[in-house]
């Protein structure tokens, strides 16, 4: 998370996870990259599942999408089918078991729920009538926008997308931007804690990253 804040999109964190797998677990770069790619794909699948579940449970809150129930059902079936295909493909191409893939998917969804809970807490502070199910629709869209390599740490993109979506629920853009910035500052604090753990972990350092570059 620390590296994601200072690099475009999610590239920084992914590169450092590949680096950590290469150094600590002695994996070759191809295997390490495939593991990180698998986790990223499962994360996106988890985000899509959260979005679909939230959309179904939020009732008429998001009529602006203008999607019929039959269209939503078809989307859900396609999403589940795609999930099965992705998991099967990953299982064939890697040594990851189905049980581990399921665990990774669940952990990815729980991680996304962290942002949802944080935004809900800040919304309650401002006395905003936003439900968890509504945030299950909004936050996945915000997440997908921020992982695009457009700005550093998704700064500006996160605020714009969140303000636009919350405006559709009648929330003032100024309050939406404040909540988004509070979420960003929360991520910075968590990232700094992660960085402290990272630099105190044996056999990890930026000098080793230079060694990898020389070998590649």
Name each model feature, range by range.
Residues 47-48, 54-150, 157, 171-181, ...:
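Predominantly cytoplasmic-facing regulatory/coupling regions of multi-pass membrane proteins
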Residues 19, 120-124, 163-164:
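Transmembrane alpha-helix boundary and packing residues in multipass membrane permease domains
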Residues 37, 161-164:
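Short amphipathic alpha-helical face segments that pack within enzyme cores
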């Amino acid at each position: 998370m620390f590296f994601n804040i200072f690099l475009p999109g999610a590239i920084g964190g992914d590169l450092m996870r590949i680096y950590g797998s290469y150094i600590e677990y002695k994996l070759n770069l191809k295997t390490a990259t495939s593991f990180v790619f698998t986790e990223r794909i499962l994360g996106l699948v988890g985000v899509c599942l959260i979005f679909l579940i939230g959309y179904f449970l939020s009732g008429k809150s998001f009529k602006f999408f203008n999607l019929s129930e039959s269209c939503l059902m078809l989307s859900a079936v396609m999403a589940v089918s795609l999930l099965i295909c992705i998991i099967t493909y990953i299982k064939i191409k890697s040594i990851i078991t189905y049980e581990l893939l399921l665990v990774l998917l669940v952990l990815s969804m729980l991680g996304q729920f962290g942002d949802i809970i944080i935004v809900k807490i800040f919304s309650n502070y401002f006395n905003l009538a936003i439900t968890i199910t509504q945030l299950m629709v909004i936050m996945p869209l915000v997440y997908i926008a921020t992982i695009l390599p457009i700005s550093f740490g998704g700064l500006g993109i996160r605020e714009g997308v969140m303000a636009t979506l919350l405006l559709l629920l009648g929330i003032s853009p100024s309050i939406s931007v404040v909540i988004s910035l509070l979420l960003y500052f929360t991520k910075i604090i968590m990232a700094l804690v992660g960085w402290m753990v990272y630099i105190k972990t044996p056999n990890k350092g930026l000098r080793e990253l230079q060694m990898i570059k020389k070998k590649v």
